[in-house]
Regions:
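Alpha-helical oligomerization segments
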Residues: 211-272
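Short amphipathic alpha-helix segments
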Residues: 200-209
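Polybasic, lysine-rich low-complexity intrinsically disordered segments
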Residues: 5-6, 28
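Extended, low-hydrophobicity segments enriched in charged/polar residues
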Residues: 47-201
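Ala/Thr-enriched low-complexity intrinsically disordered regions
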Residues: 2-4, 12-16, 20
Length: 272
């Protein structure tokens, strides 16, 4: 059987309005202006982000927080994780360090993406050493892949961050700041070197290194092979981390962390 297509007749009951060519041009012009405004404003925002310094960012998002350990006890919203199991260190040092590396790298990967903008901040503590300003710490020379990015490395001398703790006045803290993307960091080998700080394993990084994630609003710091701190200016930014790595939370501080982040957490829902 031959099938004939039925022609759909236009609805003539509703009045139609003819759009003039000039109206079309005006609509296109308005759309173009709106599009250009979006692009312009986006570029302005990006330019502001590029020009924002670490101090600008910290003053805006982490007011009164000093970038020095212990971060967890200096900020309201945070998690302290246990990396190494102390009894295991005496039994099997290699197995102990493998757990330390695995946990530290897993948490770092969870928090940082390749496209994230990150301040890599290093605190080096010395007595007066004028030649230090001419040297890039190994933190940057070894573990930053993009050598062009290294040209943006900033150096400043600030008062010794532990002066109140140790009562030492003749030391000063040399702070190095590099703004880069997550993809520029050899994070696996870098995290391992940070974890090696207090154990007889090389390579090691002696200085405090902080990963200030400009994109997500988190700060990550491994204080040694025992543990690491993650703080944020938003509870939302840490909820998934709290849920998925709940078993790694340091029990000593668990009650405080649960009180801060546990209200939206269902027991038994965590997984690693």
């Amino acid at each position: 059987l031959a099938v004939t297509k039925k022609r759909i007749q236009p609805d003539t009951s509703a009045p139609t309005k003819r759009i003039a060519l000039g109206d079309i041009r005006r609509l296109k012009s308005v759309g173009r202006r709106e599009y250009n405004n979006v692009i312009y404003n986006g570029c302005k925002d990006y330019e502001k982000r590029c020009k924002m310094t670490l101090d600008d960012y910290m003053n805006k998002h982490f007011p009164d927080l000093m970038l020095c350990p212990p971060l967890f006890y200096s900020w309201e919203i945070g998690i302290r994780f246990e990396l190494g199991n102390p009894p295991m260190f005496r039994i099997d040092k290699q197995q102990y360090m493998e757990q330390v590396y695995d946990r530290a790298i897993s948490i770092y990967k969870y928090l940082h993406k390749e496209s994230d903008e990150i301040f890599v901040v290093t605190n080096a503590h010395f007595a007066d050493e004028p030649n230090l300003i001419r040297r890039k710490p190994k933190v940057y020379r070894r573990y930053i892949t993009n050598k062009e990015v290294l040209k943006g490395l900033k150096h400043k001398v600030i008062p010794y961050v532990f002066a109140d703790v140790y009562g030492i006045d003749d030391f000063e803290t040399h702070r190095f700041i590099l703004k880069c993307f997550g993809r520029d960091i050899k994070y696996m080998s870098m995290i391992k070197a940070i974890c090696n700080n207090d154990v007889a394993i090389k390579p090691k990084i002696y200085h405090d290194v902080f990963f200030v994630n400009f994109t997500t609003g988190t700060i990550f710091h491994v204080y040694d092979d025992r543990g690491c701190d993650v703080v944020s200016n938003s509870k939302t930014a840490l909820m998934n981390l709290y849920r998925d790595y709940n078993e790694w939370i340091l029990n000593y501080d668990r009650s405080r962390i649960d009180q801060t982040l546990g209200s939206n957490f269902t027991e038994g829902s965590h997984s690693i």
